[in-house]
Amino acid sequence: MIPSQEYRKSVVHQPENVPSGFRGATHWLAGKVHRRQSKQQALLEQAHTIHTAAEAHRTLSLVDLQAQLLSFRDHFRRRARGYEQHISAAMALIVEASHRQLGLRPFPVQIMGALALLEGSLIEMQTGEGKTLVAALAAVFLGWSGRSCHVITVNDYLASRDYARLEPLYTFCGVTASCVIGELKRPERQRSYQAAVVYVTSKELVADFLKDRLLLHGVSDPSRHFLHSSNTLREGDEVPVLNGLWAAIVDEADSVLVDDAATPLIISRPVKNEPLMEACREAVRLAAKLQPTLHYTVEERYKQIALTSEGNATIEQMLPTLPPFWHSATRRNELLLLVLNAREFFRKGKDYVVSDGKVVIIDEFTGRLMPDRKWQKGTQQIVELLEGVEPTDPVEVAARISFQRFFRFYKLLCGMSGTVKGVTAELWHIYSLPYVAIPTNKPSRRTTQAPEYFLEKGAKYAALIATLEALHRQGVPILVGTRSVRESEFLADLLRQKMLNFQLLNAIYHKEEAAIIARAGERGNITIATNMAGRGTDILLEQGVAALGGLHVLLAEPNEAERIDRQFYGRCARQGDPGTSYSYIALDDRLLQRFFPERFLNSVMAEVLLRRLPGSHALMQLLVYLAQQMAQRMAYQQRLSLLRRDEQLDQLMSFAGSGPKF
């Protein structure tokens, strides 16, 4: 490969700063234009034309079909004049190739989705509509470019599964494909990343990106990495594994680009820091003597804690027995507030679990265990001490980057999800991703029951179990959704008391995730799941279950993002199947407790529900809506603030001549 080709493949796109002010207003207007209905209708009409053209290719021999595909591949790789005009003709051949190689004939709506991806859009397709195949149709085109296309999946299982299923199509179309999973060693990763289409999780991809940056020995501008490699690498030296960041198709895009956006991926190494460990132990011991309300106040809504005058006085009285370090008010308050925050806001079974004597973080939005993720600045050690496990050594950060910053490096970014509505403005503002809604192939047959509201959780769970028992007697499969491991375990205990058999899927019992979710559509099955609920794995109905009404999903508590509720409801009624969704909400649910005064909920709203006043359900629905809107607005502002700080730091580093830091 000649140097210019090598450089082109390894260069990284440098994004502009997030628009603000007048530029932000014009950018917002541009997003409105991109979302116009006429554009979506034009894509659907083009898709129907392609679907009709593909039917005419049924008579082609396998040899002729492949010959025409390879001819288009060469044409697109050369980017010959007018190549865009041939997208429809080439797509029709790929549709036929999919039917021959996979036994799957894409529907017009799937073709529409692929066309939208090629335009760099974010598409919303409902669960079960075949997003995996949609990504493959687009990936063939992007693979023909001669540069790598990364297909981002939720976990290693899906990366391996999708690659194995779709590899025959890629090979037939003259496109190399591979997958990168956690168990691969670095030489294997380098070979895999050379493929035209690479299936990989965001975690593995970003970690490899950071490790590549560390190999550059201070050359932190990614676009200069080839020049550094050419002039400094010797035979036998470790080399970067990535093949540039050109195109990415992100599955479950709302989870990756929004929920995980501000999460930093960190390359770190443990370091001994005995003074910090001793300070954490002393802080935990002191905090044990402090009581809420008397010594400190708790602001649940903003997750803030403040010491009272009584609290400060109590600490002052302890000073003579403490080491000199504690005589600094700033230092001791910082450590004590860390302990109090961990004690008041970090919940075992919700934020973390203790497994094999270790504190393991749970992802807030997916419910998955994150064994490689650690809290910073002493928080990890404090939680470990509070749980009575051996504290781990603190870590020294070698490199870090947030997911939202990383994905802005791609020249062509596109994605798909079943739950995009609600974050379309943010995705346009941060990533310049226009939104395209893809219609369902068949009309939805989901029945949505009106939400049920209760004064407290005890009554809510009693009603949920009563509904579950009635449905179980009918033989229908049932999926119960919870927000936390603790809640899922609590419901599991209730079902054990009722002598009901069930499957439990949460961060503790996660290894059989795909198998558990796949069986959730069998007659009479009861499945309890946290938010991890098998995104990317279809729930297929057992024969005869559709006649009973299909899968019934029961949501035990509203999430902070309404789209996560919708994602859970979307587990039922796929591809025209019947299904029913239920939701249960209590005044003492965490969402309402966080955003509304306790006195208002326990007096005014309790009285409204107790008396069943007219409009009480509409008022409760409004409260849930407002709470979810406030939660998402706060989360968005935090993500935007983090990105702006990153941009300011880049500008300072560039001014100093050292380029962006990772």
From Swiss-Prot:
Enzyme class: translocase
Protein localization: Cell inner membrane; Cytoplasm
Keyword Protein transport: yes
Mode of membrane association: Peripheral membrane protein
Keyword Cell membrane: yes
Keywords associated with the record: ATP-binding, Cell inner membrane, Cell membrane, Cytoplasm, Membrane, Nucleotide-binding, Protein transport, Translocase, Translocation, Transport
Pfam families registered for this protein in UniProt: P-loop_SecA, SecA_DEAD, SecA_PP_bind
Top-level taxon: Bacteria
Main subcellular location of this protein, as a coarse class: membrane
Secretion signal, residue range per the UniProt entry: none
One example of a Gene Ontology biological process annotation: intracellular protein transmembrane transport
Coiled coil regions in record: none
GO molecular function: ATP binding; protein-exporting ATPase activity
GO-annotated cellular components: cell envelope Sec protein transport complex; cytosol; plasma membrane
Function of the molecule: Part of the Sec protein translocase complex. Interacts with the SecYEG preprotein conducting channel. Has a central role in coupling the hydrolysis of ATP to the transfer of proteins into and across the cell membrane, serving as an ATP-driven molecular motor driving the stepwise translocation of polypeptide chains across the membrane.
Subunit structure: Monomer and homodimer. Part of the essential Sec protein translocation apparatus which comprises SecA, SecYEG and auxiliary proteins SecDF. Other proteins may also be involved.
Sequence similarity: Belongs to the SecA family.
Annotated protein name in UniProt: Protein translocase subunit SecA 2
Source organism (scientific name): Chlorobium chlorochromatii (strain CaD3)
